[in-house]
């Protein structure tokens, strides 16, 4: 009769425990307003229909941004965007009450597309300009015009 012996080796596992501590500081994003929450008025006065070309009659948009606290998280960014009823011929222009006429917003001389956030520094805000634009081939009537848009600042 053969005898088979089993030798059991017990391995000893060592286990180390360590406590983990989590900590941080909760930061509330600042509440910011544009131009003290007042309507920004841009008056183009009399605009010659034949002179509307996307550069004539360009005017600076006078705006400011103020925030209720100076606390800033360096990982967060302030952005500026604008919205309104887009024209059917220019994605950087809002439509007006006259078909084929829009108001385009520009930043640094370039089209500022509607609903596109632009990272800004509140101490060095970009210059925004507004300019009338018209749809190619449209005959515009002689009439008063108006257009509406909303500037929005976000901090996230």
Predicted regions and their residues:
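Mature extracellular/passenger domains of Gram-negative fimbrial/pilin and adhesin proteins
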Residues: 2, 16-156
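Sec-dependent N-terminal signal peptides
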Residues: 3-13
């Amino acid at each position: 009769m053969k005898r088979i012996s089993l030798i059991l080796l017990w391995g000893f596992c060592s286990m180390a425990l360590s406590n983990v501590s989590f900590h941080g500081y909760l930061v509330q994003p600042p509440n910011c307003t544009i131009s003290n929450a007042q309507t920004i008025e841009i008056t183009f006065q009399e605009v010659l229909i034949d002179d509307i070309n996307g550069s004539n009659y360009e005017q600076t948009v006078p705006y400011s941004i103020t925030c209720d606290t100076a606390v800033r998280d360096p990982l967060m960014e302030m952005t500026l965007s604008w919205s309104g009823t887009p024209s059917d011929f220019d994605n950087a222009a809002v439509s007006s009450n006259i078909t084929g006429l829009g108001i385009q917003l520009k930043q640094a001389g370039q089209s500022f597309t509607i609903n596109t956030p632009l990272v800004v520094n509140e101490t060095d805000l970009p210059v925004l300009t507004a300019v009338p634009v018209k749809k190619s081939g449209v005959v515009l009537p002689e009439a008063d015009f108006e257009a509406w848009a909303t500037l929005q600042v976000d901090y996230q």
